[in-house]
């Protein structure tokens, strides 16, 4: 609690000049859980603002980084108050039972974590999550997304460019990484290849243990319904409790009051 009291809000609740919004834009939504006795943990991904490393757009490296947070919540990993010292901080308030929810990219990472079988993850409620990054951007060898595909989205989500001094330390090396990512991605044109896509296909995971309530908009033309179906089938194949909630909205969270998406 002492560490939390000394934290500064602008480290995680800040205005993004590139998007024109404040992250996290839906922070009040978590009041629903807090009022019901849950603790809420929000974590930046690797390569994002105030973090380290490269943003890798859904790779196994990114998923493993999020898994480390769950391991900390279950007491299986050590964490420190900041990057410079060795003062350990424990999640002694956590009972080790973790659930996840979130939309779009935050729904996608849930699929990735569920596929790892990380201990402590009991259930997920992903909204408009991506099951396979190849199938998000391509369909049987035809590009149906942006030309840059995962390399472009990785750059967009990097976030470290908000801090110009920090960005200067990785700009050249990260540019080289993105170039290699594009080379791998287009090794077979727009056809699938293991080099870029297999570690971003969460349906291939063999560690599924948790339950899932998968939420998907029938009119979502960003993350299409195929993604929800693919992940539903993976949970079913693993013999797990999985349900789907389909609504008539698009790329939205139907419980948010400002979306006005009716649930049939």
What are these language model-derived features?
Residues 34-50:
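Conserved alpha/beta-hydrolase
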Residues 23, 49-68, 76-80, 256-263:
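Catalytic nucleophile-loop/oxyanion-hole region of alpha/beta-hydrolase
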Residues 46-49, 131, 251:
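Alpha/beta-hydrolase active-site loop signature
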Residues 221-229:
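Conserved alpha/beta-hydrolase "acid-adjacent" motif
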Residues 39-44, 97-102, 107, 122-128, ...:
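Structural recognition of the beta-strand scaffold that forms the well-ordered cores
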Residues 208, 214-216, 220:
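Short beta-strand/loop motif that positions the catalytic acidic residue
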Residues 2-19, 23-30, 35, 63, ...:
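Accessory cap/linker subdomain of secreted extracellular hydrolases
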Residues 235-253:
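Catalytic histidine neighborhood in serine/cysteine hydrolases
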């Amino acid at each position: 609690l002492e560490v939390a009291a000394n934290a500064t809000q602008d480290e995680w609740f800040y205005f993004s000049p590139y998007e024109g919004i404040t992250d996290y834009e839906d922070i009040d939504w978590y009041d629903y859980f807090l009022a019901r006795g849950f603790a809420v943990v929000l974590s930046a991904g690797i390569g994002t603002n105030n973090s380290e490393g490269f943003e890798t757009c859904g790779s196994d490296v990114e998923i493993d980084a999020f898994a480390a947070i769950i391991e900390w919540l279950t007491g299986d990993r050590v964490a420190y108050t900041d990057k410079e010292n060795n003062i350990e901080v424990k999640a002694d308030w956590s009972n080790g039972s973790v659930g996840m929810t979130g939309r779009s990219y935050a729904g996608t990472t849930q699929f990735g974590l569920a596929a790892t079988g990380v201990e402590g993850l009991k259930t997920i409620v992903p909204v408009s999550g991506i099951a396979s990054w190849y199938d998000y951007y391509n369909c049987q060898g035809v590009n149906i997304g942006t030309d840059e595909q995962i390399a472009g989205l990785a750059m967009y989500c990097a976030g470290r460019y908000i801090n110009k001094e920090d960005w200067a330390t990785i700009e050249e090396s990260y540019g080289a990484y993105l170039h290699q990512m594009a080379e791998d991605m287009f090794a077979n044109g727009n056809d699938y290849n293991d080099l870029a896509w297999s570690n971003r296909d969460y349906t291939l995971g063999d560690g599924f243990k948790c339950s899932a309530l998968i939420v998907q908009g029938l009119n979502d033309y960003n993350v299409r319904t195929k993604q929800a179906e693919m992940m539903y089938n993976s949970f079913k194949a693993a013999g797990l409790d999985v349900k789907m909630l389909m609504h008539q909205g698009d790329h939205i969270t139907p419980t948010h009051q400002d979306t006005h998406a009716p649930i049939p």
